[in-house]
C-alpha cells in the first residue's frame, strides 16, 4: 500500500520504519527541517514500561489543588480561553477512581511491555547507537506514605509479570551508589530492572536513517494543510501545492493532531501537557546516576547519558505555549542539585520545553479512526518513546491486516464513544 505518515517524532518515524519493513511504500511528512525537533527532542530519556501509569490516579484532584500553591509543584495549570482545556481536565479527574486507574494502567502496561519487547528486537537487528543503557530505573520515595502507596502499583506489576524490587534506603544506595552522598533524604524506592534509558533524539535520527534505507521518503519543511476525503474515505494529504495520494494515512502529529483533525469531525481527547528538561554536562561520573532515577515527590526524572545528565519532568496545562518558564528551570535544578549535587555542571545546562500529547485516561490512541483510511498513533503523553516501538508494530499489523501480538482493546478512539 501507499502510506503517508504525518509527523516526524519518535512515534511517526518508528511507525514509518515498521510499515516500510512490512513492504509498504511510505512517505513521511514533517513541518520542521529534520526529525525529533519537537516533543521527542529532549525528553527525560527513559524507556520505562513498568512505570507506565496514568496521571489520572486516585487522590490526584486533591493533590493537584495543593500543588497549585507550592513553589516546586510537579503540576500547574495556566487557564486559557480554550474551553477544551476545562473539558479535558474534567475528563481526567473523572478517571481518578481506583477502578478506572486499574483499567487504564493495565492497558498502558500491556502496550508498554510489548513495546519493550519490540525495542529489544529492533535494537538487536539494527545495532543503532543512542547512548542506550539497560540498567533499570529507580523510583525514589522521600516519605513512608509514598512507599506505602507504591503497593497499588506493585499489584499491577505482579499481575502483568513485570520484575521489580521494593527497596529500603540502603537498597536504593546499592542500586544508585551516588545516593549515598545524600543519605537521609530517601526512605525507599521501587526498582524496575527491565527498564532502559537513552537519548530519544539520537534514536529517532538513527531510525530515520534506517527507514530511508528501506525506502521511506522523508519530506521536510512540509506544512500539512488537510486530509482529502472521497466518499467518506481518507485518500490523500494536501500540503500547499503538493498532493500525496495514499491508501492509508497515519496521523502521528502528537498534540497537534487534535486541531488538525477537528475539521474532519473527529474529537480527539488529546491535550498538550507541557514538560521541561535540563541537559547538563557530567563532571563527576561517580557522583551521577548510573541510569534513571525518578523523584516521586516532584515527578522529575534524572537520566545518565554517556557524558551528559538529563533532568526532565513537570506537567503544565497552558495550551500550545512554548515559552520557557524560569520557575520550571529552578525546580529541575533544585531536584538534581538535591540528589546529585556533584554530578553535573548546572551552570552550563540547556533548558528545553516540549508538549506531550496526553489523553484524559493516559492511554494513547493507536489504531483506526472512524474515517476509513485514517489511522491514529498519538496521545502517548510522557511515554512516547517507551511506547513508540510497540505502537508502531501494532499499528503496522492492523493496517496490514496481520495478526497482532497483543490485543488493541481499549487502545483506540472507540473507547471514548
UniProtKB/Swiss-Prot annotation:
Gene3D superfamilies tied to this protein: D-Amino Acid Oxidase, subunit A, domain 2, FAD/NAD(P)-binding domain
Reactions that this protein is recorded to catalyse: a D-alpha-amino acid + A + H2O = a 2-oxocarboxylate + AH2 + NH4(+)
Record EC number: 1.4.99.-
GO molecular function: D-amino-acid dehydrogenase activity
GO cellular component: cytoplasm; plasma membrane
InterPro entries found in the cross-reference section: DadA (IPR023080), FAD-dep_OxRdtase (IPR006076), FAD/NAD-bd_sf (IPR036188)
Transmembrane segments: none
GO biological process: D-alanine catabolic process
Keyword Flavoprotein on entry: yes
Listed pathway(s): Amino-acid degradation; D-alanine degradation; NH(3) and pyruvate from D-alanine: step 1/1
Cofactor(s), names only, from the UniProt record: FAD
Taxonomy, superkingdom: Bacteria
Keywords for this protein: FAD, Flavoprotein, Oxidoreductase
Keyword Oxidoreductase found: yes
Family: Belongs to the DadA oxidoreductase family.
Task performed by this protein: Oxidative deamination of D-amino acids.
PANTHER family xrefs: D-AMINO ACID DEHYDROGENASE (PTHR13847:SF280), SARCOSINE DEHYDROGENASE-RELATED (PTHR13847)
Protein name: D-amino acid dehydrogenase
Organism of origin: Aeromonas hydrophila subsp. hydrophila (strain ATCC 7966 / DSM 30187 / BCRC 13018 / CCUG 14551 / JCM 1027 / KCTC 2358 / NCIMB 9240 / NCTC 8049)
Originating gene: dadA
Amino acid at each position: 500500500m501507499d502510506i503517508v505518515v504525518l509527523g516526524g517524532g519518535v512515534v511517526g518515524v518508528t511507525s514509518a520504519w515498521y510499515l516500510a519493513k512490512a513492504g509498504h511504500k511510505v512517505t513521511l511528512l514533517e513541518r520542521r527541517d529534520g526529525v525529533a525537533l519537537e516533543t521527542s527532542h529532549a525528553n527525560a530519556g527513559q524507556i520505562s514500561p513498568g512505570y507506565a501509569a496514568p496521571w489520572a490516579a486516585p487522590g490526584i484532584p486533591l493533590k493537584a489543588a495543593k500543588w497549585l500553591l507550592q513553589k516546586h509543584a510537579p503540576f500547574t495549570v495556566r487557564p486559557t480561553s480554550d474551553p477544551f482545556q476545562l473539558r479535558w481536565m474534567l475528563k481526567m479527574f473523572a478517571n481518578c477512581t481506583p477502578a478506572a486507574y486499574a483499567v487504564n494502567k493495565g492497558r498502558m502496561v500491556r502496550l508498554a511491555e510489548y513495546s519493550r519487547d519490540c525495542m529489544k528486537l529492533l535494537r538487536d537487528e539494527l545495532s543503532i547507537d543512542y547512548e542506550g543503557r539497560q540498567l533499570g530505573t529507580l523510583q525514589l520515595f522521600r516519605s513512608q506514605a509514598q512507599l506505602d502507596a507504591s503497593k497499588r502499583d506493585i499489584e499491577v506489576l505482579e499481575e502483568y509479570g513485570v520484575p521489580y524490587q521494593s527497596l529500603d534506603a540502603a537498597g536504593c544506595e546499592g542500586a544508585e551508589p551516588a545516593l549515598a552522598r545524600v543519605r537521609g533524604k530517601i526512605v525507599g524506592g521501587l526498582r524496575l530492572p527491565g527498564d532502559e534509558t537513552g537519548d530519544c533524539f539520537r534514536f529517532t535520527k538513527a531510525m530515520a536513517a534506517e527507514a530511508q534505507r528501506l525506502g521511506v521518503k522523508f519530506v521536510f519543511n512540509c506544512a500539512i494543510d488537510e486530509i482529502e476525503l472521497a466518499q467518506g474515505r481518507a485518500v490523500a494529504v494536501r500540503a500547499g501545492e503538493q498532493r500525496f495520494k495514499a491508501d492509508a494515512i497515519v496521523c502521528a502529529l502528537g498534540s497537534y493532531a487534535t486541531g488538525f483533525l477537528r475539521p474532519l469531525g473527529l474529537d480527539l481527547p488529546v491535550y498538550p501537557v507541557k514538560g521541561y528538561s535540563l541537559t547538563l554536562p557530567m563532571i563527576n561520573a561517580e557522583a551521577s546516576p548510573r541510569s534513571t532515577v525518578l523523584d516521586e515527590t516532584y515527578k522529575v526524572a534524572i537520566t545518565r547519558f554517556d557524558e551528559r545528565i538529563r533532568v526532565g519532568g513537570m506537567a503544565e496545562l497552558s495550551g500550545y505555549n512554548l515559552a520557557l518558564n524560569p520557575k520550571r528551570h529552578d525546580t529541575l535544578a533544585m531536584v538534581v542539585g538535591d540528589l546529585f549535587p556533584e554530578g553535573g555542571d548546572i551552570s552550563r545546562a540547556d533548558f528545553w520545553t516540549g508538549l506531550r500529547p496526553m489523553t484524559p485516561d493516559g492511554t494513547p490512541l493507536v489504531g483506526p479512526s472512524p474515517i476509513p483510511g485514517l489511522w491514529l498513533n498519538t496521545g502517548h503523553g510522557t511515554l512516547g518513546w517507551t511506547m513508540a516501538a510497540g505502537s508502531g508494530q501494532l499499528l503496522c499489523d492492523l493496517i496490514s491486516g496481520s495478526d497482532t501480538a497483543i490485543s488493541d482493546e481499549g487502545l483506540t478512539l472507540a473507547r471514548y464513544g
